[in-house]
Amino acid sequence: MNLHRVITSRASVSAQLGIVCALTVAACGGGSGSGGNSSSLSAAPPAAMGFADTALVSNSGAVVATANKIDANLQNPWGIAVAPGLPFWISDNNSNLSTLYSGIGAIETQSITGSANVGIAIPASVAGVQANPTGQVYNGNGGFLIPTGNGQETALFIFDGEGGTIAAWAADSGAAAVTAYDDGVASGANHAVYKGLAIGTVGGATYLYATDLHNNKVDVFDTNFTKPTAMQGKFVDPNIPAGFVPFGIAALNGDLYVTFAKQDAAMHDESTGAGLGYIDIFDFSGNLKSQFASAGSLNAPWGIAIAPAGFGSLQGDLLIGNFGDGTINIFSPNGTALANFEGPLMSSNGQPIAFPGLWSLVFGNGDADKPMTTLFYTAGFADQTDGVFGGITVASTPTPVGY
């Protein structure tokens, strides 16, 4: 399918997310990890303004009363990617799909697949292991050619996953992505388990950055989906204790933010628990610039976003989403020193907002249905079997409910 037809076929959306009823998810408990290291951050009182949550899409009857739409394919959603004029693309870890939604919850996957009930398939590895997609990025820079029915085309949306693969979709790919790189179990004991993905440029060249939790590293790929040999840094911080490995990653304001989680005994997943997390800032060549946050309120952190003007009084603060306890913590940058912890994001009823199985945090891009002051999120609640895609705005009325 031609991508231009996808854009022009989309209905014009003028409604804003902020007018929809609020939903605040009840806080979940801590994970199975130990108490972790004591924080080197000084915790300030939680921010005073309140925020409201709207569940836009879910696969579960647990949020039918508040979600605008129900989509059975939205199972443990992780990464969110967005491009101007296009829907949000979401990586559905359990269903091995990508599904598309507007900023007000309209299901738009049918613009690609022809049916709202059919997602874009993310293929298994050569060994037949499911992709279980996690991170996802939009590529607007060219390169990253993949085969389609009309020859080689630039991949527009790129995915990585726990199956150790990098998959990609181009404008004429139809209802399935293709595998562009495979480092799954067929590669042996050191196969990759990718948990996050970012895209950025160094000296005019574009690269992908994939966090490999299994092997404690960040894999870098050039526009041919090959690993360059001349990258300066190795995304290493000697001040992070052994056992903590790259987990989430985000390109923000010209830097790469990498979250570190405690690796579990199977070397496949993160351990959760209070204080189990670190966040570093690297340049796009992999050189450490500074450690941003350390232990304290961190609990398997994954999602990262920078608050824009209009998001309460938090402009310029970093919002860090904990997978472990579902909270969104506010950090005020402090130069190259550790950031100041300002407290959790609060609902209008004075309670911390928390989403069991919290993954992505992404602000809108300014499209009519994606306000820049709305914080969109994904979460895989019910022990990562179900999913919700929603948005958070400054609260106008104190009407949160739980699920």
Per-segment meaning from a language model:
Residues G33-Y403:
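Sequence/structural signature of beta-propeller domains
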Residues T24-A27:
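C-terminal motif of bacterial Sec signal peptides marking the signal peptidase cleavage site
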